[in-house]
Structure formats: C-alpha cells, structure tokens
Amino acid sequence: MTIADNKKAFFDYFIEERYEAGIVLEGWEVKAIRAGRVQIKEGYVVVRDAEMFLIGAHISPLQSASTHVKPDPVRTRKLLLKADEIKKLIGKVEQRGYTLVPLNLHYTRGRVKCEIGLAKGKKQFDKRETEKQRDWQREKARIMKGGKE
C-alpha cells in the first residue's frame, strides 16, 4: 500500500532502476507516516561511508507526539539496503549524470519501505517532450471514448 509518491521525480528524471530500501525511523515518525503526514517531493538520497541516507524528506509530527522527544521533521534518515546493492549503486552514482531519488513510501509486511530510483536528469526539452506525449495520450483516450458512444 502506497503512503506517499514523488511525482516530481518522474517529471524531472528518467528512472532507470528501482530498489526497495528499509528506513530507520523513530516511533513518532512511524505514527506520523501512518497518519499520512509525510512528503518526499524535496527528498534525495546520498551515499556516505558506504551507507545510504535519505535527506530532505519531511515528516510532520503529530500534536500528540512525545513531550520528552523534540521531533525534527527533516532529519537525515538512514536507508537499509544489502551490501551488494549499495556497492552497485555507488558505482553507478559515481558515473556522471546519475543520482538517487526517493520514488515512494509504502508498506511491506507492516514495515515502512522507501522505493529509490537510479535516475538520470532530464533536460528542459525532454520535459516538454514528456508533457506532449502525456497530452497526446490524454487526447487519444478522449477521442476513443467519444467514438464508442
């Protein structure tokens, strides 16, 4: 079940590969995510010391959050991947033009997971071309729907 999607990532990048990663979360973050108070549009993934971290994802704390814990909505969160996946991703990210972006947050067997994508940035004309394709698909569907009535 999807919790949050990063639609901006599909507009700004060509997604070449996808990986599912676990996230190290605190208790209040899990409660807030279950309540749907998460936004990953501004998030990105970095590699530090052969570990992956999610930066810029915003999890708004609930009003009933613990009094003794000071919630930080945009703290850096560690991503959990297998060692061979991390090595493969490090090799690809070091190539020019590749980056890692969070695509969505979802549940897998009750755990919150983050789907990350190995992405290559789109140029402005690529974005315009994608928009034209999307408009054409929409127009084609409208024509087909109108023709069946």
UniProtKB/Swiss-Prot annotation:
Q: Which Gene3D superfamilies match?
A: 2.40.280.10
Record bears the keyword Disulfide bond? no
Designated gene of the protein: smpB
Name the principal localization, coarsely classed.
Answer: cytoplasm
Where does the protein end up? Answer: Cytoplasm
* Annotated NCBIfam families: PRK05422.1 (NF003843), smpB (TIGR00086)
GO CC terms on record?
A: cytosol
**Which family does the record assign?**
Belongs to the SmpB family.
Query: Which InterPro entries does its entry note?
Result: SmpB, SsrA-bd_prot, SsrA-bd_prot_CS
Annotated GO biological processes are: trans-translation
This one is known as: SsrA-binding protein
> Carries keyword RNA-binding?
yes
> Keywords on this record?
Cytoplasm, RNA-binding
